[in-house]
Amino acid sequence: MNGGEKDSLDDSGVDKSSMLWEMTRSLDTFELSSSSRDTPNVDNASAGAASIDTHGGTATPTSSLVSGSGTSEHGGSSNAGTMDNNQIRKLVPFDEVPLLPGEKPPLKNAQDVSYLCPFHDPIRGTIYVTNYKLYFKSVDPAFVLDVPLGVISRIEKIGYHSSKQENSYGIEVVCKDMRSLKFAHKQEGHSRRDIFTKMTQYAFPLSNNLDFFAFEYKEDFQENGWAVYDAEAELKRQGLPTETWRICNKNAGYRLCDTYPEIFGVPALADDPMLEVVAGFRSRGRLPVLSWIHPETHATITRCAQPLVGVTGKRCTEDEKYLSYIMEANTHSSKLYIMDARPLVNAVANKAMGGGYENEEVYKKNAEVMFLDIHNIHVMRESLRKLSEVCFPNIEDNHWLSNVENTHWLDHICCILSGAIKIVHKVEGSRSSVLVHCSDGWDRTSQLTSLAMLLLDPYYRTLKGFQVLIEKEWCSFGHMFETRYGHGVDNYSDSYRSPVFVQFIDCTWQVMNQFHNAFEFNENFLVTILDHLYSNLFGTFLYNSEKIRLEKNAKARTESLWSMVNSNADLYLNPLYTRYPQQSVLFPVPSQRRIRLWKTYYCRWNPRMRSQQLLVTRGIELLGLRRTLQKTVDEARREVAINQARKKDKESTSTCGVTRSGGGGADGASSSGGSSPGGQSSTTHQPVMV
């Protein structure tokens, strides 16, 4: 080995040049479509926007969407097809920054900047900032880093003008998707100041009196994602109205509860005045309403917020009567299970703040309260922070399992999934109705109801059904996306941030791992959803409630994530999905033996951990093969059907012929000596009645 080769090895014996090739494999990959302005994104885990085909009028995700909307050189899953370097360079001129519709040319750039890659020597290049992304480009080595500004959690200056150490003066960018990026600037020229100012301005638009980039981004998708979900249509799909449940529009104009949808299902016996009283007894006015009804037993899942019983144990007769209506609506069981997502100690502590939980005694043993021990948003936020430190940038092989265990992330995933399964057992096994709530009913409650519905109803395991599930249980019922994920706000230490929705998607992935053919969508679909949870490219996850999205006119002014997904469905379909009748209700095993860390998502920025398989490309190839095989099977079935029909006709003709022949003999016997007018024996027979 010569000296140059020796220098390329790190302490662990890993070839740095090979690692850089892995990180910049985007130069040898191309994601089935062109990037912005017909230009592909060259980073195989690159920026999270739709890549635009201006000729076809469609948008397909580049690797940015396939492995993540926020992307980096360290790449995520390897999701691209392949093209040689010459083709890539023809499609991506290195003297330009690829732009999305509505994205402005670089507002600021700085040359001679070094990206301090944790897996390679510093890479020198040029950094650009647009109104949507941070874009770093190096020619030698050929390398691109493309990160949507919405994914940034905080931006900090490192070092001072007096700093003498090399690469000690620059900017650190900490992202919401488990990674951090560092750039070293030259001290002369004040390039750091200008880049920092523009990056801060557009990464945190609400803090700088600007709108989200989603209001600038316009693309003519083939599908209208905003039309995926209609509240009344979904309730009718579930069978409403019935004798015991009705579709209620009492919340028109969001007068009853400003974090609920305008339309929801309530017991038929509950009139509108009762709804007002019950809403007044529930936190935030979030009264019990229908999430799902069993098509056969009519057992239901309803959701709400905690009752306002306080330390004095207040009662509300209308609320008690309302819950009795929910019980009585289910003729197969007279018992209502109240699933409180919180640990008991937390529920008791909430009494001091005016909240609390239901008293079983007032329901004459017809209600049972069960505490599911799911911890609050603060515990979950800290757990994810610890996990991010374990996964990026350095991984300790000798302590990997213990480090992951110490984050307690998988413990929380097990607990959430276990709670959802308990709901499923009560609804499906015991045929009983279940009421679910936590404190305010928009975090843990959404996790539990949506997961239980996913396990109970095969419709929600289809590509569009899962979109309906998210729109219904998360968006319309007021999960606070803006607050929980810090959209557009420069306040990374906000204690109200928490990965609640991320945990739901993680739980979905866990179930997919146990039932490979039960889901129409694939893992890439889940990663894409999480990437655009942060990207601010689409209006789907903006703001805290349906009411605010309506006030901001989000449906008219922004694109829906589902528009992009449904216009490029092949990227998100599971080739193993079986459409023939199968087990309708899923019962996954929520134990540590079966629950795994989702490395494709949490570890994708670490080249030592990410999958080297071209999963999306393989999935599309399998879909094509499946369609070919399905076509062959359909043709074979048609041919068999035709042959069977011909055989049946032939047998029928043969039978008729034999019958006619036998009938003719009888006629001849009965008319022996008879002859035709021509003197010949007659061969004409009377019709045979069969």
Give the location of each predicted region.
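Short intrinsically disordered, low-complexity coil segments enriched in acidic
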Residues: M1-N2, A80, R179, R497
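Anionic N-terminal interaction surfaces
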Residues: N2, D7-D43, G48, I52-Y128
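Phosphoinositide-binding peripheral membrane targeting modules
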Residues: K108, S114-G170
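Conserved N-terminal structural segment that caps and organizes enzyme catalytic cores in eukaryotes
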Residues: H120, L145-P148, G159-I171, R179-V424, ...
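Acidic/polar residues in short coil/turn loops that connect beta-strands
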Residues: T130, C175-D177
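A phosphate-binding catalytic loop at a beta-strand-loop-alpha-helix junction
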Residues: T302, V427, R431-L454, T508
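Catalytic activation segment of kinase domains across protein kinase-like and atypical kinase folds
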Residues: Q447-V468
